[in-house]
């Protein structure tokens, strides 16, 4: 069964509505870590424990960086299998950015503090 898709225009309308969907960032590790932006309000989930925390009473839109939506379709299909109302964003974040739609700055990855004495010359 194919995963339902949502266009960037429809998602923008939904984000501007009173009940926006939950946005899930499903980009693979490299594209995610080498990007400075994300869709407004997007959350990153890793693993089943994280998906269990998603609200079941809201629609979920999953996106990735692949214009063919491979990762987002896989994640959306799994969420649907678990009983969520999920769709994949057509064209992923690339199409969203190409249309100059709003984004948020992504938090920089957390880095461990240097070991004591590591900065001594």
Describe the residue ranges of each PLM region:
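Rhodanese-like catalytic fold shared by cysteine-dependent sulfurtransferases
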Residues: 1-17, 21-22, 29-62, 66-121
